[in-house]
């Protein structure tokens, strides 16, 4: 793998986890360019279907283009088949597109999560098009080792929504304390069969206060 590709993947922390009735996707907001903080309000979670979201790590331009492409493909799927696309099918579409471009790869590492008739699920998708269904927790980016330490220690099957949001916030806070590529705030999305919701800043601050206590 080219050295410049490895360097482009060093920033960001993203987290995905399954709870009773849905999925949490969460990221921090820092975007870096080498040693410079290029943005303090970078968007790293995109809604690609009614009940499916995607997190991004890697090159911003590549990731934004992929978000546009997969959103259109998910809409076309619904129009052609008269039903919502599943999380697995959305991950497969993304995987196929990335694999077709493997000789000129998109510099990204992605999480695709949501809920469908099969229940809640999260997939990790790499730049070569490899897609893996994660059973419960997953993290990507340079801060993922710190995030995994918290997730592995505190995650339990059957967590409720409030507990899952707090765990995601706690994992990201741990990564932001030690990883230079992560910081500037937290963005959390909750996806259930009834809604796709961006968690409010007030709620995130409440959970952050619990992690400090």
UniProtKB/Swiss-Prot annotation:
Protease in keyword set: yes
Active-site residues, as the UniProt record annotates them: 12
Locations listed in the record: Cytoplasm
Catalytic activity annotation: Cleavage of peptide bonds with very broad specificity
Molecular function terms from GO: threonine-type endopeptidase activity
Protein's name in the database: Proteasome subunit beta
Gene Ontology CC entries for this record: cytoplasm; proteasome core complex, beta-subunit complex
Role, per record: Component of the proteasome core, a large protease complex with broad specificity involved in protein degradation.
Family as reported in the entry's similarity comment: Belongs to the peptidase T1B family.
Subunit structure as annotated in this protein's UniProt entry: The 20S proteasome core is composed of 14 alpha and 14 beta subunits that assemble into four stacked heptameric rings, resulting in a barrel-shaped structure. The two inner rings, each composed of seven catalytic beta subunits, are sandwiched by two outer rings, each composed of seven alpha subunits. The catalytic chamber with the active sites is on the inside of the barrel. Has a gated structure, the ends of the cylinder being occluded by the N-termini of the alpha-subunits. Is capped at one or both ends by the proteasome regulatory ATPase, PAN.
Residues forming coiled coils: none
Lineage: Archaea, Methanobacteriati, Methanobacteriota, Stenosarchaea group, Methanomicrobia
Keywords tagged on the record: Autocatalytic cleavage, Cytoplasm, Hydrolase, Protease, Proteasome, Threonine protease, Zymogen
Activity regulation annotation text: The formation of the proteasomal ATPase PAN-20S proteasome complex, via the docking of the C-termini of PAN into the intersubunit pockets in the alpha-rings, triggers opening of the gate for substrate entry. Interconversion between the open-gate and close-gate conformations leads to a dynamic regulation of the 20S proteasome proteolysis activity.
SUPFAM superfamilies listed in its UniProt record: N-terminal nucleophile aminohydrolases (Ntn hydrolases)
EC number(s) recorded for this UniProt protein: 3.4.25.1
Keyword Protease in record: yes
Gene3D superfamilies on file: Glutamine Phosphoribosylpyrophosphate, subunit 1, domain 1
InterPro entries: Ntn_hydrolases_N, Pept_T1A_Psome_bsu_arc, Pept_T1A_subB, Proteasome_bsu_CS, Proteasome_sua/b, Proteasome_suB-type
NCBIfam families: arc_protsome_B
GO BP terms, alphabetized: proteasomal protein catabolic process
Propeptide residue interval(s): 1-11
